[in-house]
């Protein structure tokens, strides 16, 4: 069970999502992702921008500026670089140079400085970000220069001095004295560095590095010890042949996110219909026959390799290669021409977030309650009986008060015909209300309970709080469901992640007098995929007609599942935001058996915002839940 960590620090998920959106916007590609790494660079094959951990442990403003500068350099700046020259440079250093690390870092430093100037010309609003970046780097390299000189690490010291010279405000600033043979090279080095700000292409930067290395190969005795800038060893020649940020073949998005309710089994009736290749949505004619875009409809269960997007070179009369063979009776299972069925993931794809692409739900029905569970439930219900009665009385009094409220002479409502009071009274009451207030609470609740293994020492008291919710909501006739969720660790694979949902109290039976003992069936299980569970409950609640919808998540705040550790907090935060956009209020109840650390509180607030309730002593859970439930029910009455 882990929080997402950024070099042993908890990540601000809102900042991470902001940087992700920034990268996607600047690259104009949904395929691009961002991730934290040791050094900053762009991987064109993964379509991933890596941001350096160098910016950690700084003031929030400085950290944000540093991370943004990495995103600017890799998303906007990479377009100014030539990947062909990157490939040529890597080939040259492996064949001719001795000090490869120094050459690669020098190349990336000079190229970053060049593309930084290009970005500032294209987007002047980035100047303050790069100014902060330069200030932080100059402080860092000042310390590193002193340290390297004291330890006689002259290659690293020379690199730090080169950075200082390149970013100096005054042209009079010179390279410091190091070693006699290096000092003799100082005029030559400074002369070459003057060419950097005149370079307008990657090729010219490469030429400067080659000229510098020709001279420095004779005076340097060791390669660099530290890594300040990073050039990954990738197949840049191949990367240059494909789109830089976009996917090579990208299917158009549907106008609505609809999934077919039933998968096809191959026995459906097939109706042949003519479909014209031109229609009113066609913007421009094309030379290709039978080429069109589908923008409306539902997602099918076709295999991902069963079709491809058409190319302009495709022709209507192209030949098709197939094969046939004699079969026994009607057994066609061994025909070579038929494509063998591939193992397809059971998940719903990207509809539930990219981190849950291969997750799929398994809903469990509650078992009939045993005598032990019924006895345990009665004991729990007795402990919260006073809370439940107080809530019921409060709700009944509030509803009765609304009924007896005057329906005329109000400050808001329908305008009556007694308008003279507008001129004769200082605070006139000119409105009335026609309809009678409803005697029912127009609200619905879902209680989502984390059943991961980390809840083993909190589950008993959690059940007690859930019993309070259930009895209170049942007494005032508010429909609700109680669902425990977990992921099966043993059966989870890279392309199949079963997630179990144990609906111990469904909506349809939540108000029955005998409902409740099934709550005792909630037990700590294995892992938890919080973001996926919230999305599944959101779908179910959207089918409800009640005006107020509340989703209460009981957890210990540690989302962790197969392949979910790195981005679990970000995915959960995205799921919460999506639910709130659809009118569902999501509230987290954080459970603990000890004092809650500030880092834990920050992490929970990153996921759920200000709608987080912290319970440092789980034994006091009913005392915490009572005012919450009171407030939510009072809000539902309006």
Swiss-Prot record:
SUPFAM superfamilies: vWA-like (SSF53300)
Domain of life: Bacteria
Keyword set, alphabetical order: Signal
UniProt feature, compositional bias: Basic and acidic residues: 247-256, 273-284, 301-310, 329-342
Region Disordered, residue ranges: 247-285, 301-354
Residue span(s) of domain VWFA: 445-632
InterPro entries, per the entry: NorD/CobT, VWF_A, vWFA_dom_sf
Signal peptide boundaries: 1-31
Keyword check for Signal: yes
Protein name in the entry: Uncharacterized protein YojO
Organism: Bacillus subtilis (strain 168)
């Amino acid at each position: 069970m882990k929080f997402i960590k950024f070099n042993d620090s908890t990540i601000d998920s809102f900042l991470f999502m902001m940087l992700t959106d920034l990268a996607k916007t600047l690259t104009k590609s949904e395929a691009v992702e961002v991730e934290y790494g040791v050094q900053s660079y762009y991987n064109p094959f993964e379509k991933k921008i890596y941001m350096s951990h160098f910016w950690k442990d700084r003031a929030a403003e400085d950290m944000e500026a540093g991370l943004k500068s990495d995103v600017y350099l890799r998303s906007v700046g990479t377009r100014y670089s030539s990947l062909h020259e990157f490939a040529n440079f890597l080939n040259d250093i492996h064949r001719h140079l001795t000090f490869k690390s120094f050459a690669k870092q020098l190349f990336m430093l000079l190229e970053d400085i060049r593309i930084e100037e290009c970005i500032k010309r294209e987007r002047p609003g980035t100047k303050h970000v790069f100014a902060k970046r330069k200030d932080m780097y100059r402080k860092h390299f000042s310390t590193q220069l002193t340290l390297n000189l004291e330890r006689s690490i002259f290659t690293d010291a020379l690199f730090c001095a080169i950075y200082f010279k390149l970013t100096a405000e005054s042209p009079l600033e010179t390279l410091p004295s190091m070693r006699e043979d290096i000092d003799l090279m100082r005029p030559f080095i400074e002369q070459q560095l003057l060419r950097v700000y005149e370079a307008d292409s990657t090729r010219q930067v490469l030429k400067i590095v080659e000229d510098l290395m020709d001279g420095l190969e004779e005076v340097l005795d060791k390669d660099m010890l530290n890594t300040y800038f990073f050039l990954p060893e990738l197949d840049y020649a191949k990367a240059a042949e494909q789109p830089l940020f976009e996917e090579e073949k990208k299917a158009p998005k549907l106008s609505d996110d609809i999934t077919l309710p039933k998968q096809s089994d191959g026995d459906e009736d097939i109706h042949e219909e003519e479909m014209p290749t031109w229609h009113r949505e066609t913007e421009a004619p094309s030379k290709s026959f039978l080429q069109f875009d589908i923008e409306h409809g539902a997602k099918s269960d076709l295999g991902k390799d069963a079709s491809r997007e058409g190319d302009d070179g495709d022709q209507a009369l192209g030949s098709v290669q197939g094969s046939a063979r004699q079969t026994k009776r009607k057994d066609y299972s061994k025909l070579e021409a038929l494509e063998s069925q591939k193992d397809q993931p059971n998940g719903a794809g990207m509809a539930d977030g990219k981190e849950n692409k291969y997750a799929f739900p398994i809903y469990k029905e509650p078992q009939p309650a045993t005598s032990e569970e019924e006895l345990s439930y009665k004991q729990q219900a007795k402990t919260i009986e006073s809370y439940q009665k107080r809530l019921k009385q409060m709700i009944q009094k509030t509803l009765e008060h609304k009924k007896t409220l005057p329906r005329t002479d109000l400050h808001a409502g329908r305008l009556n015909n007694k308008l003279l009071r507008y001129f004769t009274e200082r605070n006139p009451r000119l409105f009335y209300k026609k309809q009678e207030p409803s005697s029912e609470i127009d609200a619905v609740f879902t209680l989502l309970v984390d059943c991961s293994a980390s809840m083993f020492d909190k589950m008993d008291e959690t059940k007690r709080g859930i019993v309070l919710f259930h009895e209170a909501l049942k007494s005032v006739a508010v429909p609700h469901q109680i669902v425990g969720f977990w992921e099966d660790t043993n059966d989870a694979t890279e392309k199949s992640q079963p997630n179990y949902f144990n609906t111990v109290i469904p909506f349809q039976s939540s108000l029955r007098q005998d409902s409740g003992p099934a709550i005792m069936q909630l037990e700590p299980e294995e892992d938890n995929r919080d973001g996926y569970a919230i999305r599944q409950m959101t779908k179910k609640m959207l089918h409800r007609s009640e005006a107020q919808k509340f989703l209460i998540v009981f957890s210990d705040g540690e989302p962790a599942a197969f392949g979910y550790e790195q981005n679990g907090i970000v995915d959960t935060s995205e799921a919460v935001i999506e639910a709130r956009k659809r009118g569902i209020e999501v509230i987290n109840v954080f459970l603990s058996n000890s004092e809650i650390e500030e880092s834990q509180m920050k992490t929970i607030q990153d996921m759920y915002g200000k709608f987080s309730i912290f319970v440092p002593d789980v034994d006091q859970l009913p005392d915490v839940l009572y005012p919450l439930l009171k407030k939510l029910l009072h809000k539902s009455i309006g």
